[in-house]
């Protein structure tokens, strides 16, 4: 058992311990950066030095370190996170690994993301739910292409707090000039990113624990806080609660004739009993009657809470609709301008129809044009006709029906969407809405069914010698 937890339970009792634990805020953060920068070792060190490893786990790490470890006589703490056999054999991270730990001030969920370029889509998946990005830089190598790539993706996915951990300082003798040089280079690059990002830098050694949980005597010139202290002090809850109210409906709960509730998780903002709201896309108004949870009714609820809302009026609301404040002006549009991260081996095809899923809403749409692709090593843009695997581009998306969306930077849940291949049902891309465009003439699919359009696309792909016309371009 974990001796620290055992001691705390003995001191205050199990009920008091659980109650104290329940009321801590939860922070989700990811570690990212170039390959072999020490991401998994850093997470292992955080867990070890904050006393979050059980005795049997620690014993197993010592045993495994003798077989596949890379740290000599010291325990290889990266093995706490690198669970796949292929990861341990190669000494790299492939999948996104999640770990949980807590301190006296806060609970944490860590996403350890891969550094290799071919796993960039895995990194984007891990970043999509995080509040903070811990970006590791090897003090010997400095800022690399993958460092810039991950910083850009984290910025694109709406993360507003960066902690740049300059790792392996022990290998450069904890040299202040080396730290300063890397800091200046990174901050110069970061000027091209979102201007709302808060960036803090910390020198550390994940292998030996310097400046990870507590400040190190090796860096008397560093006047900031340790990594753990920085994570504990990040103020992100207030940002979520101060946003406009957004409630995507996931399920209509009607257990009997006397109850009709709308279940889901609040994407952003606050809601109180008595608030005037409207349902989108219908635009019909009503008033919040009850906020129902498993533990009883609440007078108010905030971002991240799973609740069921009941209204005073019987209005038509279905799964995929969004409930917002009555005075919020949320655009309804068929046309979106969005940044798309492509995650499939086959490139994105302009004009091809895909399933588009926004929050709980599923519809059909296509990319009608790619304005540019981003070279994420230097953030330069260039024109292209398609997006390859791991490519990121600014695209014009046309949907078959008007939906309510926000800019992704304002609301992740109602501004983000996934793209699904209609034939294989595989998620092939992720999109972040920049803005809803003024509706152009909406493509009508009345002349051809979705099956006919997909069948036509297959014929043109596999039997090009038939010279079949693209019927999607004939629709008017």
Swiss-Prot record:
This is Sulfate adenylyltransferase subunit 1. Pathway: Sulfur metabolism; hydrogen sulfide biosynthesis; sulfite from sulfate: step 1/3. It catalyses: sulfate + ATP + H(+) = adenosine 5'-phosphosulfate + diphosphate. The gene is cysN. Belongs to the TRAFAC class translation factor GTPase superfamily. Classic translation factor GTPase family. CysN/NodQ subfamily. CDD domains: CysN_ATPS (cd04166), CysN_NodQ_II (cd03695), CysN_NoDQ_III (cd04095). GO terms for molecular function: ATP binding; GTP binding; GTPase activity; guanosine tetraphosphate binding; sulfate adenylyltransferase (ATP) activity. Residues 167-170 are annotated as: G4. Residues 91-95 are annotated as: G2. GTP binds at residues 33-40, 112-116, 167-170. Residues 112-115 are annotated as: G3.
């Amino acid at each position: 058992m974990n001796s620290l937890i055992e001691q705390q339970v003995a001191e205050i009792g199990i009920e008091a311990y659980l109650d104290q634990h329940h009321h801590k805020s939860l922070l989700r953060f990811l570690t990212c950066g170039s390959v072999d920068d020490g991401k998994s070792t850093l997470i292992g060190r955080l867990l070890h030095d904050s006393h979050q490893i059980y005795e049997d786990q620690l014993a197993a790490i010592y045993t495994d370190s003798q077989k596949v470890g890379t740290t000599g006589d010291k325990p290889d703490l990266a093995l706490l996170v690198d669970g796949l056999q292929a990861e341990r054999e190669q000494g790299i991270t492939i999948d996104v690994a999640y770990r949980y730990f807590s301190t006296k001030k806060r609970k944490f969920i860590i996403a350890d993301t891969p550094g290799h370029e071919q796993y960039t889509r895995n990194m984007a998946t891990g970043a999509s739910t995080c509040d903070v990005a811990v970006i590791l830089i090897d003090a010997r190598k400095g800022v690399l292409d993958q460092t810039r790539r991950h910083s850009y993706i984290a910025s694109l996915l709406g993360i507003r707090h960066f902690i740049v951990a300059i790792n392996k300082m022990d290998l450069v003798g904890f040299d202040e000039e080396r730290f300063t040089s890397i800091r200046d280079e990174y901050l110069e690059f970061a000027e091209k990113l979102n201007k709302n990002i808060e960036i803090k830098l910390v020198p550390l050694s994940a292998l030996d624990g310097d400046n990870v949980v507590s400040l190190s005597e090796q860096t008397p010139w560093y006047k900031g806080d340790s990594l753990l202290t920085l994570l504990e002090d990040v103020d992100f809850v207030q940002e979520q609660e101060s946003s406009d109210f957004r409630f995507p409906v996931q399920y209509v709960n009607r257990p009997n004739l006397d109850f009709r509730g709308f279940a889901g998780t609040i994407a952003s903002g606050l809601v109180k009993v008595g608030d005037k709201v409207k349902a989108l896309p219908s635009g019909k108004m009503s008033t919040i009657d009850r906020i129902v949870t498993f533990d009883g009714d609440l007078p108010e609820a905030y971002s991240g809470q799973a609740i069921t809302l009941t209204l005073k009026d019987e209005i038509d609301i279905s799964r995929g609709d969004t409930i917002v404040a009555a005075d919020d002006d949320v655009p309804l549009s068929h046309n979106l301008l969005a940044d798309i991260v492509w995650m499939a081996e086959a490139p994105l095809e302009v004009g091809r129809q895909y399933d588009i899923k926004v929050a709980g809403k599923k519809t059909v749409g296509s990319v009608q044009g790619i304005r540019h692709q981003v070279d994420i090593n230097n953030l330069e843009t260039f024109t292209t006709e398609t997006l390859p695997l791991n490519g990121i581009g600014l695209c014009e998306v046309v949907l078959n029906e008007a939906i309510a969306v926000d800019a992704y930077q304002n609301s992740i849940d109602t501004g983000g969407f996934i793209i699904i291949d209609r034939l294989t049902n595989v998620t092939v891309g992720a999109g972040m809405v920049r803005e809803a465009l003024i509706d152009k003439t909406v493509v009508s699919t009345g002349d051809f069914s979705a099956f006919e359009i997909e069948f036509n696309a297959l014929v043109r792909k596999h039997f090009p010698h038939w010279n079949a016309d693209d019927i999607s371009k004939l629709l008017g």
